[in-house]
């Protein structure tokens, strides 16, 4: 399927896309890599992106896949937190002329967290400040992607209630964020401020941005999504505690 999408796009005249469970990018990887190498702007819609819909068990739950796809040069892995960010990701994908895009989507329902004109949404820059500290300068920055942005927002509320100003950054795309100016990147991830990442996947590459990482460094488990996430530590309370442990 992914190879066919690449062939249709390379032929010209049609913008093709294909979709499957995100876990099955294991079978798609060679064709995704060839699309990236050939600067072919294919679009892939990959769903069931975490243990958040957990009844199928670990065979169908991606954990290493976000890192594996981000590791391929010239691939835009875009994992939105809500419908507004998804629309922004589609816009970026359709405007791309030399880069394949993976839209990595949840299957479970998510709240709408972001605001902004879809014609110019800050998610198009790869990462942006979704929630600023309530008062004063942030002492900690919580970086979330996809369905875990809501976890970061809830953890922020816990920290603020404890007197710790916290910022939430939504980072749907490392690829797009790295293309921004140094000034913009520093305005989002302020130097000197402790950072915690939260993503329902392996934490291997997150030290690039974060001082501490909340993730899943093991295979998943078969359980309702909410229970699976709790068992694996993807909870607001755990994220807030990890942030507190970073601070003097």
Label every model-predicted segment.
Residues 1-67, 85-88, 95-248:
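Thiamine diphosphate
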Residues 17-18, 44-46, 77-81, 103-105, ...:
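General beta-strand structural signal in soluble alpha/beta enzymes
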């Amino acid at each position: 399927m992914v190879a066919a999408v690449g062939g249709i796009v390379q032929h010209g005249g049609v913008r093709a896309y294909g979709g499957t469970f995100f876990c099955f990018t294991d079978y798609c990887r060679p064709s995704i890599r060839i699309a990236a190498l050939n600067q072919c702007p294919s679009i892939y819609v990959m769903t069931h992106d975490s243990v958040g819909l957990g009844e199928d068990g670990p065979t169908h739950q991606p954990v290493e896949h976000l890192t594996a796809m981000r590791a391929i040069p010239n691939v835009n892995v875009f994992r939105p937190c809500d419908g507004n960010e998804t629309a922004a990701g589609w816009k970026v994908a359709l405007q791309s002329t030399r880069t394949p895009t993976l839209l990595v989507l949840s299957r479970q329902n998510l709240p709408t967290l972001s605001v902004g004109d879809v014609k110019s949404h800050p998610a198009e820059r790869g990462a942006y400040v979704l929630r600023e500290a309530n008062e004063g300068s942030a002492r900690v920055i919580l970086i979330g992607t996809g369905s875990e942005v809501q976890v970061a927002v809830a953890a922020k509320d816990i920290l603020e209630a404890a007197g710790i100003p916290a910022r939430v950054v939504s980072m749907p795309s490392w690829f797009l964020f790295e293309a921004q100016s140094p000034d913009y990147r520093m305005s989002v991830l302020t130097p000197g401020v402790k950072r915690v990442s939260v993503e329902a996947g392996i934490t291997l590459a997150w030290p690039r941005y974060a001082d501490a990482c909340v993730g899943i460094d093991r295979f998943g488990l078969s359980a309702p999504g909410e229970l699976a996430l709790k068992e694996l530590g993807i909870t607001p309370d755990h994220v807030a505690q990890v942030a507190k442990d970073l601070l003097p």
